[in-house]
UniProtKB/Swiss-Prot annotation:
Pfam family, one: ATP-synt_B
InterPro entries: ATP_synth_B-like_membr_sf, ATP_synth_b/b'su_bac/chlpt, ATP_synth_F0_bsu_bac, ATP_synthase_B_chain
The organism of origin for this protein: Pseudomonas syringae pv. tomato (strain ATCC BAA-871 / DC3000)
Role noted for this protein: F(1)F(0) ATP synthase produces ATP from ADP in the presence of a proton or sodium gradient. F-type ATPases consist of two structural domains, F(1) containing the extramembraneous catalytic core and F(0) containing the membrane proton channel, linked together by a central stalk and a peripheral stalk. During catalysis, ATP synthesis in the catalytic domain of F(1) is coupled via a rotary mechanism of the central stalk subunits to proton translocation. Component of the F(0) channel, it forms part of the peripheral stalk, linking F(1) to F(0).
Key words of the record: ATP synthesis, Cell inner membrane, Cell membrane, CF(0), Hydrogen ion transport, Ion transport, Membrane, Transmembrane, Transmembrane helix, Transport
CDD domains xref list: ATP-synt_Fo_b
Name of the molecule in the record: ATP synthase subunit b
Subcellular location(s) per record: Cell inner membrane
Subunit field text: F-type ATPases have 2 components, F(1) - the catalytic core - and F(0) - the membrane proton channel. F(1) has five subunits: alpha(3), beta(3), gamma(1), delta(1), epsilon(1). F(0) has three main subunits: a(1), b(2) and c(10-14). The alpha and beta chains form an alternating ring which encloses part of the gamma chain. F(1) is attached to F(0) by a central stalk formed by the gamma and epsilon chains, while a peripheral stalk is formed by the delta and b chains.
Residue intervals passing through the bilayer: 12-32
Amino acid sequence: MNINATLIGQSVAFFIFVLFCMKYVWPPVIAALHERQKKIADGLDAASRAARDLELAQDKVGQQLREAKAQAAEIIEQAKKRGTQIVDEARETARVEADRVKAQAQAEIEQELNGVKDALRAQLGSLAVNGAEKILGATIDQNAHAELVNKLAAEI
């Protein structure tokens, strides 16, 4: 194979093509590759930031959930304490009311007892006078001896 003008012409054309490609085609291709590489790096950074943000959000949600559970437990405990307090107050109110009713009933019983005692004393006085009349066989003046009968009834 001889080196002739065709081979030299083809070599010159190839060399010019390579220079043209290096000068005009290669820089935009390299720029596109660098831009694509930068976009990929930015996407990876954004993905790692998103992963960190997701992890932080999950931690925050977990913390808020724990706080909500603690707050709910505290509210339940306060409700239990308030319920116990209400029951104790109702119990105390019922006890006071029962004591009041008991004292009122006791006073009514005492009043009724005093009334019955007075009635019994009055009857006892007249019975004593009647009994004394029958025993003595004479009439006793009830008005004259009322003071004596009242003293006797008071002693009884």
